[in-house]
């Protein structure tokens, strides 16, 4: 068995994509150690942006490009580092030397466990074991989420330590020893960070793409100007591209240096406050206020790199982003049920199309794996048969003359449901996906052999047979069929067993995984009403528990009021 495949869960490579690098954990203390993000506001000035301006890019756009390429860690892409704050981390460090007992070690252990989870594929022995054997763990795809555990535990421990320092009954010797150990540990950590600063190469896997783009741009410009491609010109272009890579790496190093300096200053200030508090030279209230101000300044200034005035838009500007194009208006004239593919954008990473139409694209971090497989193996390769089975009636393309989106009708779309003439059985999912390359999906359904038992009667061709969508209410979908013989229907809806149930004339029927990602149903001869209902057991159970809990709360409240009334009457 491939070590990257799992049953009932995500692929390992996919699930552990957002693993935090071990050295990257230092972003808890220095936010810019690995550059920050792929689209934040890290740079005010940038060598890379300066070079972009030299070749004609506007200043704002050049700086935007520089910010988009600042991150060079393992997680590609990312919207920013997980930063706890230098002040908070110093207080946590003090707590580790000052506090005693089970609370310290339990919070520390829980926090470190979260960090180990966040390391993901970098600690395979632990995390691959948990992925394979911890119930439901393989359903999640971002190990970096594990950092929420230390984010809670370390802060609690820091607050407990400050409270104990200011209001606890502690000997001067204990406080002095803890402060000294904290200061030594702080200097040691700064030394490690300094070593990393000088040892890092600040390279990213995307740097090669930057160089290639710049080399290509220079060669294209030279060709347009009539220059012949020569070895000398190629060498000049290589040096030109290399200059951009060197510039962005210099920017990354500068960001690390700036944030490291910032962290050292904050650590020093927090150490001074701790020293004053430990020597009783400041009262508790000023100590708490100073630490609060320092910590707030620390966190807010970093936070504004990623959430600032530029992150908000006027309501009118927001609405304009979803304004209908002429292509959208043309499609909206069709009142039928169909889907749309927008090729003018990255259809897997946009939402505007879905705002107006039933889109075959869109984005959600929690992806259905079978549909993701279909995107990567079929839709991404423009398999028209697969687009047809997804009921893609309209395709939005770019008009080469004016660059505007234009809608093209796809007359081959199969519609929301259809009967097939036969079934092609395959051994497994791999063969099922491969069969989509060459099978006439309008006439033949592709089904894995393990689902054959769910099809009581094989379909018999009937030219008069019909099946149609009556109503789609999202969670309830109704169809009607009429056939003189047994049929097999393919529904242009994604196969998802965790909640979807099928009924034929009110009797539950088995849904068959068909064409890798769709639903199939064996339909007996005659006239029938077919219904799909989304009825997840977890929702029904939660709804029932919510009702029971609400009733119990009301009983307790009214019971308490009744007892109080009864007691007052007796008095």
Predicted regions and their residues:
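Active-site-proximal, structured, solvent-exposed surfaces of multi-pass membrane proteins
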Residues: 90, 361, 393, 447-571
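Conserved luminal/periplasmic juxtamembrane motif of membrane-embedded glycan-processing enzymes
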Residues: 1-480, 486-493, 500
């Amino acid at each position: 068995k491939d070590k990257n495949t799992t049953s009932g869960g995500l692929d390992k490579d996919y699930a552990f994509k957002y693993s935090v690098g071990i050295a990257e954990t230092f972003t808890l203390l220095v936010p810019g150690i690995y550059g920050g993000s792929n689209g934040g506001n890290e740079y005010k000035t940038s060598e890379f942006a300066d070079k972009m301006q030299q070749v004609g890019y506007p200043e704002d756009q050049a700086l935007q490009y520089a910010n988009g390429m600042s991150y060079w860690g393992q997680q590609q892409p990312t919207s920013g580092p997980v930063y706890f704050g230098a002040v908070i981390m110093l207080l946590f460090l003090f707590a580790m030397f000052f506090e005693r007992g089970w609370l310290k070690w339990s919070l520390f252990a829980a926090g470190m466990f979260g960090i180990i989870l966040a390391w993901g594929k970098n600690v395979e022995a632990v995390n691959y074991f948990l992925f394979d054997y911890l119930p439901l763990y393989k359903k999640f795809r971002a190990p970096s989420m594990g950092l929420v555990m230390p984010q809670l535990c370390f802060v609690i421990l820091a607050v407990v330590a400050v409270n104990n320092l200011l209001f606890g009954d502690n000997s001067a010797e204990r406080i002095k020893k803890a402060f000294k150990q904290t200061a030594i540990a702080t200097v040691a950590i700064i030394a490690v960070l300094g070593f990393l600063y000088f040892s890092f190469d600040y390279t990213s896997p995307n740097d090669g793409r930057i160089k290639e783009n710049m080399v290509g741009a220079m060669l294209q410009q030279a060709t347009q100007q009539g220059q012949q491609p020569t070895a000398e010109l190629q060498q000049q272009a290589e040096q030109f591209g290399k200059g951009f890579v060197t510039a962005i790496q210099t920017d990354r190093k500068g960001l690390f240096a700036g944030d490291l300096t910032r962290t050292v200053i904050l650590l020093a200030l927090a150490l001074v406050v701790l020293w004053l508090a430990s020597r009783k030279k400041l009262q508790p209230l000023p100590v708490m206020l100073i630490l609060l101000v320092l910590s707030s300044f620390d966190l807010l200034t970093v936070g504004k790199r990623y959430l600032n005035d530029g992150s908000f838009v006027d309501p009118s500007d927001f609405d304009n982003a979803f304004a209908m194009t002429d292509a959208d208006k043309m499609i909206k004239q069709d009142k039928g049920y169909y889907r749309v593919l927008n090729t003018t954008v990255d259809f897997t990473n946009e939402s505007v199309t879905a705002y107006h139409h039933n889109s075959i694209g869109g984005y959600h971090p929690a992806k259905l794996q079978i549909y993701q497989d279909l995107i990567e193996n079929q839709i991404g390769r423009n398999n028209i048969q697969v687009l047809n089975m997804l009921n893609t009636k309209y395709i939005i393309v770019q008009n080469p003359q004016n660059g505007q989106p234009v809608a093209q009708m796809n007359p081959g779309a199969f519609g929301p449901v259809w009967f097939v003439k036969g079934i092609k059985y395959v051994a497994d999912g791999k063969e099922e996906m491969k069969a989509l390359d060459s099978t006439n999906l309008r006439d033949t359904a592709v089904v894995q052999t393990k689902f054959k038992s769910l099809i009581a009667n094989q379909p018999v061709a009937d030219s008069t047979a019909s099946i149609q969508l009556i109503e789609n209410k999202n969670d309830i979908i109704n169809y009607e069929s009429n056939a003189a013989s047994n049929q097999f229907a393919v529904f242009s809806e994604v196969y998802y067993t965790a909640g979807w149930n099928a009924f034929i004339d009110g009797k539950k029927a088995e849904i068959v995984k068909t064409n890798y990602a769709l639903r199939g149903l064996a339909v007996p001869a005659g006239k029938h009403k077919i219904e799909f209902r989304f009825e997840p057991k977890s929702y029904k159970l939660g709804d029932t528990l919510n009702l029971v809990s609400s009733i119990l709360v009301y009983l307790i409240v009214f019971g308490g009021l009744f007892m109080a009334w009864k007691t007052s009457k007796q008095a």
